[in-house]
Each structure stands twice: as C-alpha cells, then as structure tokens.
UniProtKB/Swiss-Prot annotation:
Disulfide bonds join 65-68. Heme binds at residues 25, 28-29. GO terms for molecular function: metal ion binding; protein-disulfide reductase activity. This is Thioredoxin C-3. GO terms for cellular component: cytosol. Coiled coil: none annotated. Belongs to the thioredoxin family. It comes from Corynebacterium nephridii. It comes from the Bacteria. Residues 29-140 form the Thioredoxin domain. PANTHER family: GEO12009P1, THIOREDOXIN 2.
Length: 145
C-alpha cells in the first residue's frame, strides 16, 4: 500500500498489516497517518490524491463561512477516530482552481475520493455523529463494490 506523507509529499510503501503500528515517513520521519486533518492546496493536491491508496475525505471550506467554522471541530474529531482515512481541508478562497475543479456550489462540501475518483459528496455542516454515520455508509458501499 502506498501512503503519501502529508508533511513532505514522499511516497511510502507500507504493508497493510503495519498500518496499525502508526508508521512514520521514511524521508521526514513524521507520522504517515495523522489523526488530524491535513491541508491540501493547488501545489500538493495532485501528488497526494493520485498516489495515496487510502481514501481521502476532503472538506472544501472558506474562512468567512460560519457553518464551515462550526463543522471544523466535528471534522477533526471524526479524523481522530478514523486512522485509515485521510482527512484533508481545502480552503476554496486560497485555491480557486481546486474549487472550480470540484464544481463547488455551496460550502462546506465534503468529497470522498478514492485516488482520483470522487466516490461520494455531501454539502452542509454535519456534527460528529452525522459525519461518522455518513462516512461509514460510504466506506461500506465502497467495500461492496
């Protein structure tokens, strides 16, 4: 399994059975499975998304968005509970090309990616339990496919 380091962008080959021991990057020695959302931008998005074998849940948000700010701690809480999903945030104001590529119509918008394929999307602020239930449902559907 390939895991892209959120800190330095290096690709790391990690056997699936080693994921439970919280592996570190071979290049920068940072945790490969951070238990908090990472920041993606127009510079690191393509490398990260196309090379990560883990599902990536992206929160498309903006600084001025009240519901986005309300949802942020819930998104971070669910990230702590799901080490085998990468939680990422993209600031739509700072990254307008990514916002356009995702065809964002309202924020916050959550997009679940499997490599470069969008597998699910939901718009609107979610609380911890709602977000966890939605994510579980999407991951179960992916396992069934």
């Amino acid at each position: 399994m390939i895991i892209v380091c959120a800190s330095c962008g290096a690709k790391n080959r990690v056997p699936e059975e080693k994921l439970a021991v919280h592996p570190n990057c071979g290049q920068c020695h940072q945790a490969l499975l951070p238990l908090e959302p990472i920041e993606l931008n127009e510079q690191n998005f393509s490398n990260f998304i196309s090379n990560s074998d883990l599902p990536v849940l992206i929160d498309l948000w903006a600084e001025w968005c009240g519901p986005c700010k309300m949802m942020a701690p819930h998104f971070a809480q669910v990230a702590k509970q799901n080490p085998y999903v990468v939680f990422a945030k993209i600031d739509t104001e700072a990254n307008p090309r990514l916002s356009a590529a995702f065809n964002v119509r309202s924020i916050p918008t959550l997009v679940l990616m499997n490599k470069t394929t969008e597998v699910a999307r939901i718009s609107g602020a979610l609380r911890t339990l709602e977000l966890q239930q939605w994510l579980d449902q999407q991951l179960q559907q992916q396992q069934g496919n």
